[in-house]
Amino acid sequence: MLVELSIKQFAIIEQLTVSFDKGLTVLTGETGAGKSIIIDAIGLLLGGRGSAEYVRYGEKRAEIEGLFILEPKHPAFAKAEALGIQADDGMIVLRRDVTNQGKSICRINGKLVTLGILREIGQSLVDIHGQHEHQTLLHKEQHLSLLDHFAGPPLETVLDEYKELYKQYLALERQLAQLTENEKEMAQKTDLFQYQLKEIEAANLEPGEDKRLEAERLKLANAEKLFKSVHDAYNNLYGEGRGLEWINNALTHIEDASSYDPELGKLQQHVQEQYYLLEEAMFTLRDYLDKLEFDPTRLEMIESRLHELQKLKRKYGDSVDAIVEYASTIEEQLDSILHKDDRIKQLEQSLETMRLDLEVESAALTNIRKQIAMELTESIHEQLRALYMEKTSFEVKFHETAEGKKPFRENGVDDVEFYLSTNPGEPVKPLAKVASGGEISRIMLALKTIFSNHQGVTSVIFDEVDTGVSGRVAQAIAEKIRHISVGSQVLCISHLPQVAAMADTHLYISKKEVGGRVTTEVRALKDEEKVEEIARMIAGVEMTELTKEHAKELLDLATSIKCNH
């Protein structure tokens, strides 16, 4: 949900920070105080169209920032993570600056992003009713997803099975496409792979050969230095006045001393062990010198072989092992190409089998969806009746293709769209085309009542959805908005006292003059202040004790409704 909103130098707002809570927050105030400006700022934060006109006169830029706290599994986190944006502690911070030149600077959790990315993340967080671009319920491409969410568990298992099968189907299609690409390219690949294999096989490579030869070359190329170093080491150990003789003399003296002090026996043993180790090392050095030889012919052969291997490395890999692995890969591909007709036949048979399975699975999906569509239709009609729109018709249409056979897609074959008719005798039309005129607010409210828990958004904003209604319709609208706020945070600008009475938090928007300029202020109303404001909404300028009593009655009614639901 939206926890905090900060607005600076936006329209008439100089600086404003508003904290929001869960449930229903209603914003009221006199005309022109800045209620819709706050909603405009949120719309801009969610990726709406920006303009230099939004920047307060005389300022360089407008700044809007919103802090959202979400459930760990909210889809916004997956989207942010895919874009390399860190989202710590379940928080997402959106920020947008608009300069007086009309340029936008967008950030998510401090990272610069494009306006498109800001819009994509923003629309998964908030749905604004009142700004057409945020009315996700009007978007046809959302209707199948909404229907599936409404269906819940009965559909999920079948849909998951279909998706897994569809993924395998696409993989087989890609393999078949690779095999059936144009003959000229296949012939070129065949010639290339055959040439490469012939060249690699002619080299008679052995795994790890390059590493072994490089080690041997190092030894042969430095044979003279190697001989001198080993010979000097040997001479330092063996011979008169050399290392072993000195240690042997020391051992004799320690042995004599230990006859007077037994404690030296351990030292004698230790020195004797070291003597034997050095003696063994001396013999090893002697044997090494006896075997050491310099073979110029062998060195030349190694250099030649390493040069040959280096040429292959430049073409096929950075080591002999990598070249061998590459050869194995192209050998498989070559075999596949040379036997492609058999492989194509095999893939086509597998695809046909899988296609039949997909038809069965997609048909099962369609049947479930059509059953759920009837339940959804009845639920929507129930909501419309509660809003005194019993003559409005709602339908979920499953579009058919001209050929009758629908293509497989990630979520099945169904092309679903919501249709509506607001007048008896008139045919239903696509929801987006009917969405105009005074009744649309109630229609959208009915839809949102059903789908508020299925859209994924955490916050729903209603910007004066109650214009032009009163009486029982106004009370019905208030109750629907309250119902939506149970599952989603709702922010609502309203002129209806019935809606204001339902508020969990009532914010009053006012404007004042500071330094010769007007700015907007927001404050949360306390109990008595709520009565005063609702009475003002009922009566206008002239408030009486009667209007205050009416306001209290509305608040009592709202409390009763909340307690019973």
From Swiss-Prot:
Give yes or no: UniProt keyword Transmembrane helix: no
Residues that bind ATP: 29-36
Q: Which GO terms describe its molecular function?
A: ATP binding
Keywords on this record? ATP-binding, DNA damage, DNA repair, Nucleotide-binding
Q: Look up the signal peptide feature and give its range.
A: none
Which one GO biological process term can you cite for this protein? Answer: SOS response
Recorded hits in CDD domains, A to Z, give: ABC_RecN
Q: Gene Ontology cellular component?
A: bacterial nucleoid
Q: Which family does it belong to?
A: Belongs to the RecN family.
Per the entry, what this protein does is: May be involved in recombinational repair of damaged DNA.
How is this protein named in the record?
Answer: DNA repair protein RecN
Which species is this record about? Halalkalibacterium halodurans (strain ATCC BAA-125 / DSM 18197 / FERM 7344 / JCM 9153 / C-125)
